[in-house]
UniProtKB/Swiss-Prot annotation:
Keywords (A to Z) from UniProt: Disulfide bond, Hydrolase, Lipid degradation, Lipid metabolism, Secreted, Serine esterase, Signal
EC number(s) from the headed UniProt entry: 3.1.1.3, 3.1.1.-, 3.1.2.2
Role played: Catalyzes the hydrolysis of p-nitrophenyl esters, alpha- and beta-naphthyl esters, and triacylglycerols, with a preference for medium acyl chain length (C8-C12). Shows a much higher hydrolysis rate of glycerol esters of unsaturated C16 and C18 fatty acids than that of their saturated counterparts, and a preference for cis double bond. Is also able to hydrolyze several natural oils and Tween detergents. Also displays thioesterase and phospholipase activities, towards palmitoyl-coenzyme A and diheptanoyl glycerophosphocholine, respectively.
Domain of life: Bacteria
Keyword Secreted attached: yes
Signals that turn on the gene: Expressed once the cells enter stationary phase, with a maximum at the late stationary phase.
Name assigned to this protein: Lipase
GO MF annotation terms: carboxylesterase activity; long-chain fatty acyl-CoA hydrolase activity; phospholipase activity; triacylglycerol lipase activity
Example of a GO cellular component annotation carried by this entry: extracellular region
Biological process according to GO: triglyceride catabolic process
pH dependence: Optimum pH is 9.5.
Top EC group: hydrolase
Length: 268
Protein backbone atom coordinates (compact mmCIF):
# COMPACT_ATOMS: atom_id res chain seq x y z
CA UNK A 1 0.00 0.00 0.00
CA UNK A 2 1.36 3.43 -0.95
CA UNK A 3 1.23 6.13 1.72
CA UNK A 4 0.05 9.69 1.27
CA UNK A 5 2.70 12.41 1.00
CA UNK A 6 2.20 13.45 4.65
CA UNK A 7 1.81 9.91 5.99
CA UNK A 8 5.03 8.80 4.34
CA UNK A 9 6.95 11.52 6.16
CA UNK A 10 5.44 10.59 9.51
CA UNK A 11 6.15 6.90 8.97
CA UNK A 12 9.77 7.64 8.18
CA UNK A 13 10.15 9.51 11.46
CA UNK A 14 8.61 6.63 13.42
CA UNK A 15 10.68 4.02 11.62
CA UNK A 16 14.08 5.62 12.32
CA UNK A 17 14.38 4.48 15.99
CA UNK A 18 13.34 0.95 15.04
CA UNK A 19 16.03 0.76 12.39
CA UNK A 20 18.59 1.93 14.94
CA UNK A 21 17.61 -0.93 17.29
CA UNK A 22 17.39 -3.68 14.70
CA UNK A 23 19.84 -2.37 12.11
CA UNK A 24 22.19 -5.37 12.36
CA UNK A 25 19.56 -7.94 11.45
CA UNK A 26 17.93 -5.70 8.89
CA UNK A 27 21.23 -5.32 7.08
CA UNK A 28 21.43 -9.07 6.35
CA UNK A 29 19.23 -8.65 3.28
CA UNK A 30 20.17 -5.73 1.07
CA UNK A 31 17.04 -3.87 -0.04
CA UNK A 32 16.08 -4.24 -3.67
CA UNK A 33 16.37 -0.98 -5.60
CA UNK A 34 12.95 -0.09 -6.94
CA UNK A 35 12.50 1.59 -10.28
CA UNK A 36 11.14 5.13 -10.19
CA UNK A 37 7.91 5.80 -12.06
CA UNK A 38 8.49 9.34 -13.37
CA UNK A 39 6.08 11.54 -15.34
CA UNK A 40 7.26 14.83 -16.87
CA UNK A 41 4.48 17.32 -17.53
CA UNK A 42 4.44 20.89 -18.74
CA UNK A 43 5.29 23.30 -21.52
CA UNK A 44 8.23 23.93 -23.86
CA UNK A 45 10.63 24.55 -20.99
CA UNK A 46 10.06 20.94 -19.95
CA UNK A 47 9.74 19.43 -23.43
CA UNK A 48 13.12 20.91 -24.31
CA UNK A 49 12.40 23.36 -27.12
CA UNK A 50 15.69 25.05 -27.96
CA UNK A 51 17.86 22.10 -26.92
CA UNK A 52 17.61 20.17 -30.20
CA UNK A 53 17.59 16.37 -30.61
CA UNK A 54 13.80 16.11 -30.75
CA UNK A 55 12.00 12.79 -30.72
CA UNK A 56 10.37 12.64 -34.15
CA UNK A 57 7.36 10.82 -32.72
CA UNK A 58 6.59 13.81 -30.48
CA UNK A 59 5.66 16.01 -33.45
CA UNK A 60 4.93 19.63 -32.60
CA UNK A 61 5.40 18.92 -28.88
CA UNK A 62 9.16 18.86 -29.61
CA UNK A 63 10.25 16.56 -26.80
CA UNK A 64 14.03 16.60 -26.66
CA UNK A 65 16.42 13.89 -25.52
CA UNK A 66 18.47 16.81 -24.14
CA UNK A 67 15.63 18.13 -21.97
CA UNK A 68 16.06 18.01 -18.20
CA UNK A 69 13.35 15.32 -17.76
CA UNK A 70 14.95 13.02 -20.35
CA UNK A 71 18.40 13.61 -18.85
CA UNK A 72 17.13 12.85 -15.34
CA UNK A 73 15.47 9.63 -16.51
CA UNK A 74 18.58 8.54 -18.42
CA UNK A 75 20.78 9.05 -15.36
CA UNK A 76 18.54 7.01 -13.04
CA UNK A 77 18.74 3.36 -13.99
CA UNK A 78 15.44 1.56 -14.29
CA UNK A 79 13.29 4.69 -14.43
CA UNK A 80 9.88 4.14 -16.00
CA UNK A 81 9.60 7.43 -17.86
CA UNK A 82 6.45 8.98 -19.30
CA UNK A 83 7.11 12.25 -21.12
CA UNK A 84 3.95 14.22 -21.93
CA UNK A 85 5.25 17.80 -21.72
CA UNK A 86 4.46 19.70 -24.91
CA UNK A 87 5.54 22.92 -26.57
CA UNK A 88 2.90 25.62 -26.25
CA UNK A 89 1.03 23.89 -23.43
CA UNK A 90 -1.17 25.88 -21.10
CA UNK A 91 -2.70 24.74 -17.83
CA UNK A 92 -5.81 23.53 -19.66
CA UNK A 93 -3.67 21.38 -21.96
CA UNK A 94 -2.05 19.66 -19.00
CA UNK A 95 -5.49 18.84 -17.62
CA UNK A 96 -6.88 17.65 -20.95
CA UNK A 97 -3.92 15.90 -22.58
CA UNK A 98 -1.01 15.16 -20.26
CA UNK A 99 -2.25 13.47 -17.09
CA UNK A 100 -3.07 9.96 -18.36
CA UNK A 101 0.18 8.35 -17.09
CA UNK A 102 -0.13 10.01 -13.65
CA UNK A 103 -1.64 7.48 -11.23
CA UNK A 104 -1.33 5.92 -7.78
CA UNK A 105 1.86 4.15 -8.87
CA UNK A 106 3.64 7.36 -9.86
CA UNK A 107 6.68 8.18 -7.74
CA UNK A 108 7.84 11.49 -9.25
CA UNK A 109 6.20 14.27 -11.25
CA UNK A 110 7.95 17.36 -12.61
CA UNK A 111 6.29 20.31 -14.31
CA UNK A 112 6.80 23.82 -15.68
CA UNK A 113 3.54 25.56 -16.58
CA UNK A 114 1.93 28.99 -16.60
CA UNK A 115 4.07 31.01 -18.98
CA UNK A 116 1.85 30.40 -21.99
CA UNK A 117 -1.30 31.15 -20.00
CA UNK A 118 0.20 34.54 -19.16
CA UNK A 119 0.97 35.28 -22.82
CA UNK A 120 4.70 34.57 -22.96
CA UNK A 121 5.02 34.37 -26.77
CA UNK A 122 2.81 37.38 -27.49
CA UNK A 123 4.62 39.46 -24.89
CA UNK A 124 8.05 38.76 -26.35
CA UNK A 125 6.79 39.34 -29.90
CA UNK A 126 5.32 42.69 -28.88
CA UNK A 127 8.51 43.72 -27.12
CA UNK A 128 10.67 42.91 -30.13
CA UNK A 129 8.46 44.44 -32.81
CA UNK A 130 6.55 47.37 -31.30
CA UNK A 131 8.93 49.39 -29.14
CA UNK A 132 9.27 50.18 -25.47
CA UNK A 133 5.84 51.67 -24.72
CA UNK A 134 3.95 48.76 -26.26
CA UNK A 135 6.34 46.32 -24.61
CA UNK A 136 5.82 47.76 -21.13
CA UNK A 137 2.04 47.81 -21.60
CA UNK A 138 2.00 44.16 -22.68
CA UNK A 139 4.19 43.16 -19.75
CA UNK A 140 1.84 44.99 -17.37
CA UNK A 141 -1.06 43.01 -18.82
CA UNK A 142 0.83 39.75 -18.34
CA UNK A 143 1.73 40.62 -14.75
CA UNK A 144 -1.90 41.40 -13.95
CA UNK A 145 -2.90 38.01 -15.37
CA UNK A 146 -0.23 36.28 -13.31
CA UNK A 147 -1.53 37.87 -10.10
CA UNK A 148 -5.27 37.70 -10.73
CA UNK A 149 -6.00 34.67 -12.93
CA UNK A 150 -3.08 32.26 -12.97
CA UNK A 151 -3.25 31.15 -9.30
CA UNK A 152 -6.62 29.44 -9.75
CA UNK A 153 -5.42 27.80 -12.97
CA UNK A 154 -2.35 26.43 -11.23
CA UNK A 155 -4.53 25.16 -8.39
CA UNK A 156 -6.59 23.15 -10.88
CA UNK A 157 -3.49 21.48 -12.28
CA UNK A 158 -1.93 20.81 -8.90
CA UNK A 159 -5.22 19.49 -7.48
CA UNK A 160 -5.48 17.07 -10.41
CA UNK A 161 -1.92 15.80 -9.92
CA UNK A 162 -2.45 15.38 -6.18
CA UNK A 163 -5.73 13.55 -6.71
CA UNK A 164 -4.27 11.13 -9.24
CA UNK A 165 -0.94 10.52 -7.48
CA UNK A 166 -1.30 11.35 -3.76
CA UNK A 167 1.98 9.67 -2.79
CA UNK A 168 4.13 11.07 -5.59
CA UNK A 169 6.89 13.59 -5.06
CA UNK A 170 5.97 16.61 -7.17
CA UNK A 171 8.61 19.12 -8.24
CA UNK A 172 7.38 22.36 -9.79
CA UNK A 173 10.16 24.23 -11.57
CA UNK A 174 10.15 27.93 -12.33
CA UNK A 175 11.40 30.09 -15.18
CA UNK A 176 14.73 31.93 -15.40
CA UNK A 177 15.09 35.68 -15.60
CA UNK A 178 15.93 36.41 -19.23
CA UNK A 179 18.38 39.29 -18.93
CA UNK A 180 21.52 40.30 -17.11
CA UNK A 181 20.88 43.97 -16.54
CA UNK A 182 23.77 46.26 -17.39
CA UNK A 183 25.20 43.42 -19.45
CA UNK A 184 26.94 43.10 -22.78
CA UNK A 185 24.00 43.61 -25.19
CA UNK A 186 24.61 46.70 -27.33
CA UNK A 187 21.38 46.40 -29.34
CA UNK A 188 17.89 45.04 -28.83
CA UNK A 189 15.36 45.86 -26.15
CA UNK A 190 15.77 48.85 -23.87
CA UNK A 191 17.12 48.29 -20.38
CA UNK A 192 13.74 49.33 -19.00
CA UNK A 193 12.01 46.64 -21.06
CA UNK A 194 14.54 44.03 -19.98
CA UNK A 195 14.02 44.92 -16.32
CA UNK A 196 10.25 44.67 -16.73
CA UNK A 197 10.55 41.24 -18.36
CA UNK A 198 12.72 40.05 -15.47
CA UNK A 199 10.16 41.41 -13.00
CA UNK A 200 7.41 39.44 -14.75
CA UNK A 201 9.52 36.28 -14.43
CA UNK A 202 9.91 37.00 -10.71
CA UNK A 203 6.14 37.43 -10.45
CA UNK A 204 5.29 34.11 -12.07
CA UNK A 205 7.90 32.32 -9.98
CA UNK A 206 6.54 33.81 -6.75
CA UNK A 207 2.96 32.88 -7.60
CA UNK A 208 3.97 29.40 -8.71
CA UNK A 209 6.09 28.79 -5.62
CA UNK A 210 3.20 29.81 -3.33
CA UNK A 211 0.66 27.61 -5.09
CA UNK A 212 3.11 24.68 -5.12
CA UNK A 213 3.86 25.06 -1.40
CA UNK A 214 0.17 25.18 -0.55
CA UNK A 215 -0.20 21.77 -2.23
CA UNK A 216 2.80 20.27 -0.47
CA UNK A 217 4.91 20.32 -3.64
CA UNK A 218 8.56 21.31 -3.95
CA UNK A 219 9.46 24.40 -5.97
CA UNK A 220 12.73 24.55 -7.90
CA UNK A 221 14.13 28.05 -8.43
CA UNK A 222 16.28 27.89 -11.56
CA UNK A 223 17.55 31.44 -11.12
CA UNK A 224 20.10 29.95 -8.74
CA UNK A 225 21.71 28.05 -11.62
CA UNK A 226 21.03 30.49 -14.47
CA UNK A 227 22.68 33.40 -12.62
CA UNK A 228 25.53 34.61 -14.82
CA UNK A 229 24.07 32.82 -17.84
CA UNK A 230 21.20 35.13 -18.77
CA UNK A 231 20.98 36.94 -22.09
CA UNK A 232 23.55 39.78 -22.21
CA UNK A 233 25.78 37.89 -19.78
CA UNK A 234 28.36 36.87 -22.37
CA UNK A 235 27.75 33.17 -21.64
CA UNK A 236 23.97 32.72 -22.03
CA UNK A 237 22.11 29.46 -21.56
CA UNK A 238 19.07 31.00 -23.28
CA UNK A 239 18.48 31.70 -26.95
CA UNK A 240 17.88 35.30 -27.93
CA UNK A 241 15.81 36.00 -31.06
CA UNK A 242 16.87 33.26 -33.45
CA UNK A 243 15.75 30.82 -36.12
CA UNK A 244 13.76 28.69 -35.91
CA UNK A 245 11.77 31.35 -34.12
CA UNK A 246 10.26 28.96 -31.56
CA UNK A 247 13.72 28.53 -30.04
CA UNK A 248 13.81 32.20 -29.09
CA UNK A 249 13.82 32.82 -25.33
CA UNK A 250 14.14 29.13 -24.53
CA UNK A 251 16.96 27.28 -22.78
CA UNK A 252 19.83 25.93 -24.84
CA UNK A 253 21.10 22.39 -24.28
CA UNK A 254 23.33 23.88 -21.56
CA UNK A 255 20.30 25.58 -20.06
CA UNK A 256 18.60 22.21 -19.75
CA UNK A 257 21.61 20.22 -18.50
CA UNK A 258 23.25 22.89 -16.33
CA UNK A 259 20.31 25.16 -15.53
CA UNK A 260 17.32 22.89 -14.99
CA UNK A 261 18.71 19.41 -14.34
CA UNK A 262 20.74 20.33 -11.23
CA UNK A 263 17.65 21.91 -9.68
CA UNK A 264 15.59 18.76 -10.26
CA UNK A 265 18.46 16.65 -8.93
CA UNK A 266 18.62 18.76 -5.77
CA UNK A 267 14.89 18.40 -5.21
CA UNK A 268 14.88 14.65 -5.63
Amino acid sequence: MRLSRRAATASALLLTPALALFGASAAVSAPRIQATDYVALGDSYSSGVGAGSYDSSSGSCKRSTKSYPALWAASHTGTRFNFTACSGARTGDVLAKQLTPVNSGTDLVSITIGGNDAGFADTMTTCNLQGESACLARIAKARAYIQQTLPAQLDQVYDAIDSRAPAAQVVVLGYPRFYKLGGSCAVGLSEKSRAAINAAADDINAVTAKRAADHGFAFGDVNTTFAGHELCSGAPWLHSVTLPVENSYHPTANGQSKGYLPVLNSAT
